[in-house]
Amino acid sequence: AIIMMGFSMGIYQTYFGVATTLFVLILVSDAETRNFIENIKEAFKYLLTLLGGILCYFLGNTICIRNFHVTLLDYQGINDMADVTVKSLIGSVKNAYIGFLQPILGEFCGISNQKAVRILYLAVYLMVGVLVLRRLCKRGGKLWNRIYFFVLCCLIPLSISIIYVMAVSDKTVIHTLMIYPYVFGLIYPIVLLEKEN
């Protein structure tokens, strides 16, 4: 999985957001089936897979750059992914959460240029909020598993919009090819509804 993630990032870095979102959704889906310690172990397994994929990507880039004497294009700051400061990271994370709301706030890469679509996104996001609150208020759940579930739910918008964090430039503009992970915003309620029954 690590090597495949490294290769997919080599093809197009936004695929990292797809993998990240899938991993977080799997963790959300399985959160109630394991105890807290098992959940943390599983989360670290996925985290190490993601970090390994990034490392594989950087290693592959380094090898290709040295052997083929090429340079990376400065495309929206993606070649500065490893040059992150705390300030730029905080700003990027903030932009990622704002980016998650873009389909509601206005036209976003052609997917929400109609008012009806923006209303649909708002309805889906509100439904997710209600389902998360229902799951958190459900009787019988252990406190640590609830906290774990809440943290994962807070990570969903970040994982969907992770491209904002990867491209550390303030001038990053998301375009159509970079929004594959946004599909998972619409799938998220299905994951939560599946566990309701």
Language model segments and positions:
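Transmembrane catalytic cores of multi-pass membrane glycosyltransferases
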Residues: 6, 10-178
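Cytosolic-side transmembrane helix boundary signature
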Residues: 177-197
